[in-house]
Amino acid sequence: MAALIDTGIFFGFYSLKDVHHMDSVAIVVHAVEGKWGRLFVTNHILDETLTLLKYKKLPADKFLEGFVESGVLNIIYTDDEVERKALEVFKARVYEKGFSYTDAISEVVAEELKLKLISYDSRFSLPTIGRDYWKSLDESERKRISAILREKGIDG
């Protein structure tokens, strides 16, 4: 089992004001604990995440240290075949509001490698894990995750 994690999860994790902050915190805790097996991002998601965090003045350096350099995330560098398939997916959906080339890459990679897709993006044609994740947890699990945040000195 393995999962591809989309940019919005990391943005929500670092952005305390984001509507999905607690969803992201719970997803990251469960992901790091191994709930979905090996964790992946594509080089496109990595680019998008680093750029967004830096642009929004959020800790891109902490993301690099905590997720990339630590080995928590495995990076999938897309090859020509994946890029060509993603271009076709993107072309077919070019007028769909909010659907990006990075989304097309993610969809192709998740489908080909049979990865769970962890994202808040409802435009994917594949099922996703993400929206209302925090609400789906029972009270004891929410308390456990909140205790982890307090222990680490993180607002939640």
Curated annotation (Swiss-Prot):
HAMAP family: VapC_Nob1 (MF_00265). Belongs to the PINc/VapC protein family. Its cofactor is Mg(2+). It comes from the Archaea. One of its GO terms (molecular function) is magnesium ion binding. CDD domains: PIN_VapC-Af1683-like. GO terms for biological process: rRNA catabolic process. Mg(2+) binds at D6, D103. Pfam families: PIN (PF01850). This is VapC ribonuclease AF_1683.
